[in-house]
Amino acid sequence: MVFASLEHILTHISFSVVSILISIHLITLLFVKEIIGLSDSSKKGMIITFFCITGLLVTRWVFSGHLPFSDLYESLIFLSWTFSIFYMVPYFKKSKNYYLNTIITPSVIFTQGFATSGLLTKMHESLILVPALQSHWLMMHVSMMILGYATLLCGSLLSVAILVITFQELIQIIGKSKNFYFLNESFSFAEIKYMNMTDKNNVLQKTSFLSYRNYYRSQFLQQLDRWGYRTISLGFIFLTIGIISGAVWANEAWGSYWNWDPKETWAFITWTIFAIYLHTRKNKKLEDLNSSIVASIGFLIIWVCYLGINLLGIGLHSYGSFTPN
């Protein structure tokens, strides 16, 4: 009874804090660029959310007697906790990683918000594990898969950001090209010496400004691309270990390493997509933009694999889904 009450309290605290964080991010996004007070409140809220989720997982573990990996609700809680870990590690190391934190914070907010919302109320109660899940492989397989999903989602979102910035800049350049002398086909820098001093200064200032913007944009995109590559590489390792451990577990439980179950099929598709991403990074003939497109596709594939199959409740991996077996 005590554990159930504590779990209930932690769930409501985390949901309340997440709701406040959503409001803070919406205010920052829609009305103001940056307010120090709101930024500090967001950081403190993330810390509170992290400890609430940690306490929730530990309480559920002690109360149920098994690792909290048995259904969609518990895996979502663990997923949001994994996102929080990626946020907290740089925080405790006193090292700032603005790019990852910008991606991680909304991920924690919406994952935890969905998990603790009324949509999954029926799954909030801890239940006894079904026989197929009563295995020591549960921790190895599920934890590696969730770590892989979380890491790959963070890296994929960085790639999505690269595409958004690239195409946004492309649209702006096309729209404003007529306003710049040096973007006009009839203009050449040799004509500067025939201009008066005012026009000459205007052209040079615009040229300098555009060069600075291009340099800053290039550096920014390179940093996003570098962190995206590192994050996806780590997530690919987690995903590979998770798939292999799952195959070993399947052989023990069902007598076959691979059954082409919907979850297994989409896990293989996810693995293939990110294998292609890593291949494009190693191939110098392929541009970085192409790898970002592949990673962005992978972002959608992960959600189909992780959430879509569970919501449909089909196949051997439908434990704890909306649709009963």
Swiss-Prot record:
MF-aspect GO terms: heme binding
Disulfide bonds: none
Subcellular location: Plastid, Chloroplast thylakoid membrane
One Gene Ontology biological process: cytochrome complex assembly
Membrane-spanning parts: 12-32, 45-65, 72-92, 100-120, 145-165, 231-251, 264-281, 293-313
Top-level division of the source organism's lineage: Eukaryota
Designated name of the protein: Cytochrome c biogenesis protein CcsA
Native species: Glycine max
